[in-house]
Amino acid sequence: MFSLEQFYQAYETETAEFVIKAKKFNILLPRYLYRFINPTDMLHDFPLWAKIWKASWVLSGYLADLQPDVNKRLLEIGGGVGLVSIVAATFGHKITMTEYNADALNFARANACLNQCPDLPIKKLDWNHPSLRGRFDLIVASEVIYREEDFSPLIRLFKSNVKPGGEIILASEIRKSGKDLFGLFQSDFDIFVVKKTLRSETDATTVVLLKMRLKN
């Protein structure tokens, strides 16, 4: 059983605050990354989960604005430290969060407890060998498209686990890997693209939401 006390004993953390639809969320992040990096191969399994990506912030806001339906099941893959699923659950969605990295899962569980979502289902999921029960009305993910070797497992997972007529939403900043995967998706999915721009005093970042449904 997960223990918040044991979590604090195991990890050094810092807290980031996010405000979504006037509601504050306090999210624990690793204070240092060195313990999660292999010094002999820094690019292998780099802890991409250990920060809140702008795409995750945009996806969280999208789900907060989406009318919840208790009869619909949502699934998040590659959930990292848990922001998206925590926001979705807070705004009434029935969502299951999944992640593969064990440390990320611990942070997600801690964040769920801190943000009054102790009953949020948080599960380990290997995209290459998924063990999900049933199908989902909506599958969401943010910034999961980096490695070409993940493309085929992702497509198989989506096709196997989205309900007929269900939707998949992928959020990411614009990069080449996303464009490559977009080309692969087009043969199996109808795709609608929504662009969101996050602006600050110093810059602007465009985040793309790929909204996809399996072709008939």
Question: Model regions: which residues?
Answer:
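S-adenosylmethionine-dependent methyltransferases
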Residues: M1-N216
